[in-house]
Swiss-Prot record:
InterPro entries: G6P_Isomerase, G6P_Isomerase_C, Phosphoglucose_isomerase_CS, SIS_dom_sf, SIS_PGI_1, SIS_PGI_2. The lineage of its organism: Eukaryota, Fungi, Dikarya, Ascomycota, Saccharomycotina. D-glucose 6-phosphate binds at G169, S170, S219, K220, T221, F222, T223, T224, Q364, E368, H399, K521. Keywords: Cytoplasm, Gluconeogenesis, Glycolysis, Isomerase. It comes from Eremothecium gossypii (strain ATCC 10895 / CBS 109.51 / FGSC 9923 / NRRL Y-1056) (Yeast). Disulfide bonds: none annotated. Pfam families: PGI (PF00342). CDD domains: SIS_PGI_1, SIS_PGI_2. It is an enzyme of class 5 (isomerase). In the cytoplasm, catalyzes the conversion of glucose-6-phosphate to fructose-6-phosphate, the second step in glycolysis, and the reverse reaction during gluconeogenesis. The gene is PGI1. This is Glucose-6-phosphate isomerase.
């Protein structure tokens, strides 16, 4: 049962005075605001609407918001909306360990996981900092043993491969981060198994040797159906290859879990169990023990730097006024487009191959957090909430869906991300400069477009002219990073976490539960029993019955 909502004094964002003001501003100027004119009439627009974040190590990230459909008055009204929605109060309650996840009566305290300053952080009167630090120290010792070769498998050989078995937040984060930080990889290869489709596990097991493989079973409860099924199958494979001796399991399996009983029952030595608390949501768990595969891959010192980068954004988010608060501005712009321009999507395009899984990671972060239709006031929202987030790395994306972004009928607010310095500056930075030129050109093209006169001046005539016109005035945020390092990746993730938080706070929804994933799981268990029977299934609707029966006939 949902606890009494004490975190907002409004039921619907649409009831707030600033919401009505923004609707008025949209009609008056927002829907006709010309970015080309805005730049022509204000030479300081770039300086005025861009912000530079300084990371803990002195590296910088530039956030250019100037190509967005706003002016001073609109930004002022958005800031007022944040004040009326008590965004900063809710933020402070989150950082103070209060139970802002009202439907599950839990704190939302992933920020405590990157508290490398080790300042006291309390949940229910208990300082959790020592406990967080103890888990990190355990991760450090374990990862250094494995990476150095001191940890031996059952035949005395060192570990060469790590297989992380998890799903959702126990998979997406580590997959994305290990891909993004591949440049920092050490001696170990990492593999990830998430899908219950047996192909995922089978293909992974073809690549590893049981004598030199360490399996990480990532499930907080150690009861997640897909993960435990995959882990059990991996264990059976391991035993079948190693003389069926259960004593060998302890050298080749570790658990990222809090369920000591089930972990021990599985055969894992509980000394090799890494826990995390109920106040860590799955999609925010890469900072926790779930990040062990990352620490094994890039080394603990780099993993800690990753945490410190996120911590630096937390510091900025909690101490900077609304008008200069980078994640808050990002979230407010998202609300502006979603609710006043009727934008249904949010495009994120990393101009960086290492970040190729970043959009998929952000999909879960954004859509599982804010894909809600009921507010914290326990009423249905009468406005649009979570955006459909999508993206692919560029320049590949330019050759697939950018046609729709440039000339389609929808408003698609877009974030473009580029690292100025490549880890692979081949051909004297030729590739990097080509990549960067596309990063700058795409944002410029989306803004300036190409009118009929320009098309005709280029020689087009007749019916071809309208096909070559670009309307322009399409909003983008450009994020320019000095280099993709552990600290800067941590900062980018934390930026999007707090953007997501800001959106949810404005919409007055609980961004930290995920009841929408439950119903399908329940029905899957029921249908699983149907699939074990030989007779015809008749207990569902005609479509589901028909599909099940055809599957059984073909199985």
């Amino acid at each position: 049962m949902a606890t009494t909502n004490t975190f907002s004094d409004f039921k619907l964002a649409s009831e707030l005075p600033a919401w009505a003001k923004l609707q008025e501003l949209y009609e008056k100027k927002g829907k006709t605001l010309s970015l080309k004119e805005a730049f022509a009439t204000d030479e300081q627009r770039f300086q005025k609407y861009s912000r530079t974040f300084s990371n803990h190590d002195g590296s910088k990230i530039l956030f250019d918001f100037s190509k967005n459909l706003v002016d001073d008055e609109i930004l002022g009204a958005l800031a007022q909306l944040a004040r009326e929605a008590n965004v900063t109060q809710l933020r402070d309650q989150m950082f103070n360990g209060e139970h802002i996840n009202s439907t599950e009566d839990r704190a939302v305290y992933h920020v405590a996981l990157r508290n490398r300053a080790n300042k006291p952080m309390y949940v229910d009167g208990k300082n959790v900092a020592p406990e967080v630090d103890a888990v990190l120290q355990h991760m450090k010792e374990f990862s250094e043993q494995v990476r150095s070769g001191a940890w031996k498998g059952y035949t005395g050989k060192s570990i060469k491969d790590v297989v992380n078995i998890g799903i959702g937040g126990s998979d997406l984060g580590p997959v994305m981060v290990t891909e993004a930080l591949k440049h920092y990889a050490g001696p170990l290869k990492v593999h990830f198994v998430s899908n219950i489709d047996g192909t995922h596990l089978a293909e992974t097991l073809k690549e590893v040797d049981p004598e030199t493989t360490l399996f990480l079973v990532a499930s907080k409860t150690f009861t997640t159906a897909e993960t435990i099924t995959n882990a059990t199958s991996a264990k059976n494979w391991f035993l079948s290859k190693t003389g069926n001796n259960p004593a060998h399991i302890s050298k080749h399996f570790a658990a990222l879990s809090t369920n000591e009983t089930e972990v021990a029952k599985f055969g894992i030595d509980t000394k090799n169990m890494f826990g995390f608390e109920s106040w860590v949501g799955g999609r925010y768990s890469v900072w926790s023990a779930i990040g062990l595969s990352v620490a094994l891959y890039i080394g603990f010192d780099q993993f800690e730097d990753f945490l410190k980068g996120a911590e630096a954004v937390d510091k900025h988010f909690t101490s900077t006024p609304i008008e200069d608060n980078i994640p808050l501005l990002g979230g407010l712009l998202s609300v502006w487009y979603n609710n006043f321009f009727d934008a249904q999507t949010h495009l994120v395009v990393p101009f960086d191959q290492y970040l190729h899984r970043f959009p998929a990671y952000l999909q879960q972060l954004s859509m599982e957090s804010n894909g809600k239709s009921v507010t914290r006031g326990n009423v249905f929202a009468n406005y649009s909430t979570g955006s459909i987030l999508f993206g692919e790395p560029a320049t590949n994306a330019q050759h697939s869906f950018f046609q729709l972004v440039h000339q389609g009928t929808k408003v698609i607010p877009s974030d473009f991300i580029l690292a100025a310095q490549s880890h692979n500056p081949i051909e004297n930075n030729l590739h990097q400069k080509m990549l960067a030129s596309n990063f700058f050109a795409q944002a410029e093209a989306l803004m300036v477009g190409k009118d009929e006169a320009q098309v005709k001046a280029e020689g087009a005539t007749g019916g071809l002219v309208p096909h070559k016109v670009f309307s322009g005035n399409r909003p983008t945020t450009s994020i320019l990073v000095q280099k993709i390092t552990p600290a800067n990746l941590g900062a980018l993730i934390a930026y999007y976490e707090h953007v997501t938080f800001t959106e949810g706070a404005i919409w007055n929804i609980n961004s930290f539960d995920q009841w929408g994933v439950e119903l399908g799981k329940v029905l899957a268990k029921v249908i699983g029993k149907d699939l074990d029977t030989t007779g015809e299934t008749t207990s569902h609707d005609a479509s589901t019955n028909g599909l099940i029966n055809q599957f059984k006939a073909w199985l």
